[in-house]
Swiss-Prot record:
Protein name: DNA repair protein RAD51 homolog 1
Annotated source species: Mus musculus
Subunit structure: Forms linear homooligomers, giving rise to a RAD51 nucleoprotein filament, which is essential for strand-pairing reactions during DNA recombination. Interacts with BRCA1 and either directly or indirectly with p53. Interacts with XRCC3, RAD54L and RAD54B. Interacts with the BCDX2 subcomplex RAD51C:RAD51B. Component of the homologous recombination repair (HR) complex composed of ERCC5/XPG, BRCA2, PALB2, DSS1 and RAD51. Interacts directly with PALB2 which may serve as a scaffold for a HR complex containing PALB2, BRCA2, RAD51C, RAD51 and XRCC3. Interacts with RAD51AP1 and RAD51AP2.
Region: Interaction with PALB2, residue numbers: 184-257
Tissues where the protein occurs: Expressed in the testes (at protein level). Expressed in the brain (at protein level). Expressed in the thymus, spleen, ovary and small intestine.
Keyword Acetylation on entry: yes
Keywords on record: Acetylation, ATP-binding, Chromosome, Cytoplasm, Cytoskeleton, DNA damage, DNA recombination, DNA repair, DNA-binding, Isopeptide bond, Mitochondrion, Nucleotide-binding, Nucleus, Phosphoprotein, Ubl conjugation
Modified residues (N-acetylalanine): 2
Record PTM: Ubiquitinated by the SCF(FBH1) E3 ubiquitin ligase complex, regulating RAD51 subcellular location and preventing its association with DNA. Ubiquitinated by RFWD3 in response to DNA damage: ubiquitination leads to degradation by the proteasome, promoting homologous recombination.
GO biological process, one term: DNA damage response
Family: Belongs to the RecA family. RAD51 subfamily.
Positions in coiled-coil regions: none
Additional comment: The nucleus of a mouse embryonic stem (ES) cells contains on average 4.7 x 10(5) molecules.
Length: 339
């Protein structure tokens, strides 16, 4: 009940957030853009002014019924509503200090991440099976609904599952641990099963439309790369696979920028079978190559420890030092490892 009130309260403040949050595409009508053209943009998957402002011109021209002259006018008007120029590092630092971090459920893991999973960026977790990737995702889907002072994001969660490993029972166990109503927690998680790489991408267009309607704090894709391994096979299709994957990750980054959600993706590993593997301490590497490496802001490498313990290592981050932390997978989600 309390959670529903919080989410309603956040809806009441949406008027104040108008200048900060994403602006609905209908704002362009007030700037002299034809209502029919706005409708065409919406049908093409552009639901906010930001989405239009960040789009390259050739993407808009590809929309049926949008000429080059119209695309120029739309981009000019969108740029007036969205600040896209230079800013001082002081202002940017101020904005960074307001970023919310979502607790992982483990104090040690939060300490390693300097607060938790960062909103407005992509966090990638990779590791072999049974290393806790999906369990962290399930825990985050609940903790993102907590109030900000309890390490939450005061928003709903969106879960795209490509491997069929989503289990609502796990969410109920985590909800009980935090003293939240199980039915409210499940109501605040939007779930979709991805069946192929094109469908996976299509779901992001739906996600964008839903994020305009309601406040979401977290978007999970578990796993972002599993379907690419089966839909594309062999070296002949490698270039097509990487281009499709790059487009998918670009859309995720755009959602993180536009709506300020925390995007968490899981990735699988591949064993290196070349000569270099003989000299490497750990011959496993994440799949997806450089494209996924550049798209992710923070990369976490998970591996098994003793018993129920798992080890998380910061593999790549623009601001976190390379370090490790231990955590455990318990009946009520991710927690601290017992000594």
């Amino acid at each position: 009940m309390a959670m529903q009130m919080q989410l309603e309260a956040s809806a009441d403040t949406s008027v104040e957030e108008e200048s900060f949050g994403p602006q609905p595409i209908s704002r362009l009508e007030q700037c002299g853009i034809n209502a029919n053209d706005v409708k065409k943009l919406e049908e093409a998957g552009y639901h906010t002014v930001e989405a239009v402002a960040y789009a390259p011109k050739k993407e808009l021209i590809n929309i049926k019924g949008i000429s080059e002259a119209k695309a120029d006018k739309i981009l000019t008007e969108a740029a007036k509503l969205v600040p896209m120029g230079f800013t001082t590092a002081t202002e940017f630092h101020q904005r960074r200090s307001e970023i919310i971090q979502i607790t992982t459920g483990s104090k040690e893991l939060d300490k390693l991440l300097q607060g938790g999973i960062e909103t407005g960026s992509i966090t990638e977790m990779f590791g072999e099976f049974r290393t806790g990737k999906t369990q962290i995702c399930h825990t985050l889907a609940v903790t993102c609904q907590l109030p900000i002072d309890r390490g939450g994001g005061e928003g709903k969660a969106m879960y795209i599952d490509t491997e069929g490993t989503f289990r609502p029972e796990r969410l109920l166990a985590v909800a009980e641990r935090y003293g939240l109503s199980g039915s409210d927690v499940l109501d605040n998680v939007a779930y979709a099963r991805g069946f192929n790489t094109d469908h996976q991408t299509q779901l992001l267009y739906q996600a964008s439309a839903m994020m305009v309607e309601s406040r979401y704090a977290l978007l999970i894709v578990d796993s972002a790369t599993a379907l690419y391994r089966t839909d594309y096979s062999g070296r002949g299709e490698l270039s097509a696979r990487q281009m499709h994957l790059a487009r998918f990750l670009r859309m995720l980054l755009r959602l993180a920028d536009e709506f300020g959600v925390a995007v968490v993706i899981t990735n699988q590993v591949v064993a290196q079978v070349d000569g270099a593997a003989m000299f490497a301490a750990d011959p496993k590497k994440p799949i997806g190559g450089n494209i996924i490496a550049h798209a992710s802001t923070t990369r976490l490498y998970l591996r098994k420890g003793r018993g129920e313990t798992r080890i998380c290592k910061i593999y790549d981050s623009p601001c976190l030092p390379e370090a490790e932390a231990m955590f455990a997978i318990n009946a009520d989600g991710v927690g601290d490892a017992k000594d």
